[in-house]
Amino acid sequence: MNLAAIAKNYSMHNGESGTIVPYVPPPYNFASAPTFSQRTSQMESVSLGILNQAMSSTTGASGALKDEKAAFGAMAEALRDPEPIRQIKKQVGIRTLKNLKMELATMRRKKSALKIMIFISGCVTLATSMVGGLSIVDDEILGDYKNNDWLMKTIHGLNLLCTTVLLAAGKISDKIQEEISRTKRDIAKRESYVSAASMSWNGDTEMSLQGIKYGES
């Protein structure tokens, strides 16, 4: 059998081997920019990480640590909000910060005035109490004290009045201090939100923090 017959016989038994198979190129993975859903998921991951950082820190017994926790929460909220809402809250927060700082300055002036009042009332109360104490120790002072009825009434009246003012001013000062702490915490939250809303975001976990600040005032 010659070569031509062998080739013909092979092609008859293996006819399918000569069919043309269309070429399908292998798939290629092209690099693409992060989609909106990916970006949102990454922002939520960063927000969750910030909240975990706030919860894993110290108990926040002092005012500074409480302000820090409030700042962490505000930053997490800023990263979790959509972009339009974030910009709206940023503009509103900038305007609100001015009013809050004015209120804080007013409350600090009131507290300073109350401190002066407490100091004066305390001095008068101490002086009148010392006069009453000396009248018990010294018989001569006690005699003059009893002979001058108007002096006794004046000293007792001043002592009672200044003691009442001292107690009332102390309670008012404590309430003002609570309002000051609450206002400072609100300022810290809004400053942190505005700072977080101004951060640059390039789609990865590296962010450029533009002067994150809280509780300055």
UniProtKB/Swiss-Prot annotation:
Domain of life: Viruses
S-S bonds: none
Pfam family, one: Orbi_NS3
Cited InterPro entries: Orbi_NS3
Position of the signal peptide: none
Free-text function comment from the UniProt entry: May play a role in the release of virions from infected cells.
Record-stated family: Belongs to the orbivirus NS3 family.
Protein name as catalogued: Non-structural protein NS3
Species for this entry: African horse sickness virus 5
Lineage of the organism: Viruses, Riboviria, Orthornavirae, Duplornaviricota, Resentoviricetes
Gene: Segment-10
